[in-house]
């Protein structure tokens, strides 16, 4: 927060959940916000296009600038307080502060210490059981047969099945979106 004190223009690298949360909060506080992301719409890997476009429109109405299907090629310091961002598209923007909201990585250290099977996340079966059948896992640290599941939709999809399984009625996860 202290880094924001004398800043006006904030560039956010990442158009996912965290990037959009930053954009929402900072634009609400009056900052000039630019979001740079690889997606065609915000949160592309998490929500369908119509919802993503609605989110984009709502944040645009607050002044958020979107630089989608783009990335930072180079950051060039300018004055003491700002930098010019050179994007892969050739566009340039100036920012007083750059926030990185990319690169989720699950923390699996406790699961490793417990001797559980780890891949990109904590491996679970169709019941959300780990390699120890008495330990279940849920959240952005989980890896199912479909791969790592870092987003909200797969977590919500798993909750009802996990709850039933924990209560003794082993219920497979109906479908785990990727």
Model-derived features with residue positions:
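FAD-site-proximal beta/loop scaffold in flavoenzymes
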Residues: 1-5, 81-86, 91-164
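Feature captures the FAD/FMN-dependent oxidoreductase FAD-binding
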Residues: 74-81
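Conserved strand-loop elements at the edges of beta-sheets that form or border functional pockets
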Residues: 77, 130, 173
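Short, composition-biased local secondary-structure segments
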Residues: 22-31, 83-86, 163-165
């Amino acid at each position: 927060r202290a880094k924001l004190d004398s800043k006006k223009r904030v560039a956010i690298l990442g158009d996912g959940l965290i990037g959009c949360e930053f954009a929402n909060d900072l634009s609400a506080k009056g900052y000039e916000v630019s979001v740079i992301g690889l997606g065609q719409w915000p949160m592309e890997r998490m929500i369908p296009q119509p919802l993503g476009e609605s989110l984009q429109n709502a944040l645009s109405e607050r002044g958020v600038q979107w630089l989608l299907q783009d990335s930072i090629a180079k950051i060039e310091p300018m004055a003491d307080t700002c930098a010019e961002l050179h994007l892969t598209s050739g566009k340039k923007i100036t920012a007083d502060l750059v926030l990185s909201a990319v690169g989720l990585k699950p923390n699996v250290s406790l699961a490793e210490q417990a001797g559980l099977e780890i891949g990109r996340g904590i491996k679970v079966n169709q019941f959300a059981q780990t390699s120890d059948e008495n330990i279940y896992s849920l959240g952005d640290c989980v890896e199912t047969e479909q791969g790592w599941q870092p987003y909200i939709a797969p977590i919500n999809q798993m909750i009802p099945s996990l709850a039933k399984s924990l209560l003794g009625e082993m219920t497979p996860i109906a479908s785990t979106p990727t």
